[in-house]
Amino acid sequence: MREILFRGQSIDRREWYEGDLYQSRLKSVFFISYYTEYGDRMSVGVDSKTVGQYTGLLDKNGNKIFEGDILKQKTTPEFAKVNSFEWEHYGIVRFGYYDWDEGEAGYASIGWYIEPLKSVSIKPKNYLVGHIQAGLNQSDILNKYYPMEIIGNIHDNPELLKGGGEE
C-alpha cells in the first residue's frame, strides 16, 4: 500500500515540510503536520499553491517523488545497446487525466504521469525524439530503461519550466 504523504512550503520561512495535510475550518490556511527528530508532533502553515502529494515512488537516488517535481530521464546503456540511440526527457510530475498515444493503440487514464517539457537526442545528435508522456504506474519499465532523477520542482526552480535541464 502506498504511503499517503504531502509536501508544502511554509508560509513564513519558505522551508519544505512533509507530513499529513489538513485545512483550517475557515478553509483559509493549509497545514502540514509532521514529527520532529525528537518525536514531537508539530504543524506549520503552508502555501496552498505549493502542496503536492507523494507518488509512492523514489527517484534513482532514493529521493521521494512528489507532485510538482521536475524529473530528468536518460536512457540506460542497456536501452541504448538494443535500440542504438540515446536521449533525455524532462518533465513535471502531475496527477490527473492523461491520454497516451491517442490512436487505437493508446489509452487514457487518471493517475500520476509525467507532463513533457523537453526531449533531447544524445546519440545520434539529429535523431528525432518525441515526447514521452508516461503514467507513473509504469515505473518498473521507466526505471529499467530511463530512470527518473529529481532535478528540481516547479516552485523553487521555475527556470526549468522553460525546457528542463541545460542544453
Can you say where each PLM-predicted feature lies in the sequence?
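Secondary-structure transition motif
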Residues: M1-E167
